[in-house]
Amino acid sequence: MLDKNLLKTNSKEIREQLKSRSFNLDWYDEFLRLEKQLSTLLRTIEKLNEQKNINAKKAATTESDAQRKKLIQEGGLLRAELEKNEAKYNEIKEDFDYIYQRIPNLPTEDVPIGKDEKENVEMFKSRKPTFFDFKPLPHYELATKLEMIGLDVASKITGSRFSIYKKDGARLMRAIQQFCLYVNADKYEEYLPPVIVNKDSYYGSGQFPKFVEDVFKLEGTNYYLASTAEVQLVNLHRNEILKEADLPKYYTASTACFRSEAGSAGKDTKGLIRQHQFYKTELVKIVHPSTSKQEHEAMAKDAEKILELLELPYRRMVLCTGDMGFSATKTYDLEVWIPSENKYREISSISNCGDFQARRANIKFKDAISKKNLYVHTLNASALAHDRLFVAIVENYQQKDGSIKIPKALVKYFGKEYIK
């Protein structure tokens, strides 16, 4: 979340930034109005508490029974007035928090202004897209033909937007997982976290309460399936004060992820691009505020390194204000070339969240100079989405005879050079 004091300034710049994030400025005006009411009520409550304490001391020390009786009556009136104001405060605070918790992060100055993905800006392409002297098959046709996936049986077992990897398909997914972890193993500390998380964890990473409909809740419990390992890794240090000397911290985890894909009806209904259960390797950094910009650039290169080693065509996009995630202050997307669609598809998002998540999760460090406890900055990246990487390899490395060549860098993890 954002600093309340920053939001209270109601500057023209903040209004423009929120507008560029498609945030309703009427809500912002209501936030400011409620904040003033809360400040006034808080001063009243503090004054009433002070009067109540003075009254109680006088009642305890007076020797006059009549005076004591009068003071006790006054104390009762003060308590009643205090309870009334506290109830009013709590009522307004609930409305205030509802808005405050839904205000998105503010974009940095170099983020392009735009409404949606159509206004994202391409930074560069890595290499020429893959073209063939034959008509390439979409991944779901070729992988089914080679008995690598079972979409129909997954639908029978569970339902739509689920898949089963089998034989060389399961083997390729295992190789992808290992490769994604090992490429950055020298920099990031690996974790294997639970895929079930609580509400506080989702709140800390910024998904709740705004995106509560996008995740799976375990019926009859207060637990949820994690939509990304970012949730678990960001919350490793929730409610902690770190030593400045211990920064930065780099974490990685490879997990199954679960999303309800609410609002995605009709999108990518065939194949492995958009599923309820998918797999990815996540990177998370917890860093000193002064270094987060440089750490963001380095993190993008860490994700790109995987695509470079696999010799897959990709491009880097900087997301516009209207397409960035809720918690991000700046985001790069890596998009990999999908031959059957003749276009690039997202395979990684790399976001700098500034202190937005740290404020929600209450993650601080003790500054060595000022001795103050300050909020850290957090960053996250998919490195990479395994299912989409599977799609990219199958499609870009398909051969004229219907086989799939395994990228050189992946052969030692997969164990052979071709899938036939």
UniProtKB/Swiss-Prot annotation:
Reactions performed catalytically: tRNA(Ser) + L-serine + ATP = L-seryl-tRNA(Ser) + AMP + diphosphate + H(+); tRNA(Sec) + L-serine + ATP = L-seryl-tRNA(Sec) + AMP + diphosphate + H(+)
Enzyme Commission no: 6.1.1.11
Taxonomic superkingdom: Bacteria
A GO cellular-component term linked to this record: cytoplasm
Pathway of action: Aminoacyl-tRNA biosynthesis; selenocysteinyl-tRNA(Sec) biosynthesis; L-seryl-tRNA(Sec) from L-serine and tRNA(Sec): step 1/1
Signal peptide start and end residues: none
Cysteines engaged in disulfide bonds, as pairs: none
A GO molecular-function descriptor: serine-tRNA ligase activity
Any one Gene Ontology BP term: seryl-tRNA aminoacylation
PROSITE patterns: AA_TRNA_LIGASE_II
Compartment annotation: Cytoplasm
Main localization (coarse): cytoplasm
InterPro entries: aa-tRNA-synt_IIb, aa-tRNA-synth_II, aa-tRNA-synth_II/BPL/LPL, Ser-tRNA-ligase_type_1, Ser-tRNA-synth_1_N, SerRS_1_N_sf, SerRS_core, tRNA-bd_arm
Residues annotated to bind ATP: R259, S260, E261, E346, I347, S348, S349
Pfam families: Seryl_tRNA_N, tRNA-synt_2b
Gene3D superfamilies: Bira Bifunctional Protein, Domain 2 (3.30.930.10), Serine-tRNA synthetase, tRNA binding domain (1.10.287.40)
Binding sites annotated in the UniProt record for L-serine: T228, A229, E230, E282, S382
Keywords: Aminoacyl-tRNA synthetase, ATP-binding, Cytoplasm, Ligase, Nucleotide-binding, Protein biosynthesis
Physiological role: Catalyzes the attachment of serine to tRNA(Ser). Is also able to aminoacylate tRNA(Sec) with serine, to form the misacylated tRNA L-seryl-tRNA(Sec), which will be further converted into selenocysteinyl-tRNA(Sec).
Entry note about domains: Consists of two distinct domains, a catalytic core and a N-terminal extension that is involved in tRNA binding.
Alphabetical list of HAMAP family matching this protein: Ser_tRNA_synth_type1
Family, per entry: Belongs to the class-II aminoacyl-tRNA synthetase family. Type-1 seryl-tRNA synthetase subfamily.
Name assigned to this protein: Serine--tRNA ligase
Gene: serS
